[in-house]
């Protein structure tokens, strides 16, 4: 759960050119979505959303927020050009069906779309559906 592309892609593998362009001189990035939703320093939002949907399936609070106010002061520090594209992803269970709504600030087809599309889709199908359907308890 790092915000440095050198940690994420380590083991001698170079980060993709788009990440190198967006990162600071030292490899710092803002858009590590895994960090933004799973790390305790950013609220461990994934577990909170799962717990909310398990305990209150009709909730409107099952929301992961990918932005933070400090991005305005940080997005261009030390050569960085990384202003997070995804604003939030909201999950809803209605009529025994799980839906999600993604709010984007920006999404470019060349570099961002694959990641910005894959992230909520992966969470939706691989993690949330299986954990909600099989009622796995969330550790506190």
Q: What spans do the regions from the language model cover?
A:
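Terminal, non-catalytic protein-protein interaction segments that mediate quaternary/complex assembly
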Residues: 1-140
């Amino acid at each position: 759960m790092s915000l440095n592309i050198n940690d994420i892609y380590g083991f001698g593998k170079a980060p993709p050119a788009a990440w190198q362009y967006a990162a600071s001189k030292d490899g710092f990035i803002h858009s590590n979505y895994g960090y933004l939703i799973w790390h305790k320093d950013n609220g461990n939002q994934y577990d909170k959303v799962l717990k909310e949907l398990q305990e209150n399936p009709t909730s409107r609070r099952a929301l992961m927020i990918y932005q933070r106010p400090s991005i305005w002061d940080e997005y261009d520090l030390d050569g960085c050009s990384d202003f997070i594209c995804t604003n939030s992803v909201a999950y809803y269970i209605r009529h025994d069906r799980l839906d999600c709504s993604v709010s984007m600030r920006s999404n470019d087809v060349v570099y961002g779309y694959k990641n910005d599309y894959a992230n909520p889709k992966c969470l939706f199908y691989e993690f949330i559906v299986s954990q909600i359907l099989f009622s796995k308890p969330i550790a506190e």
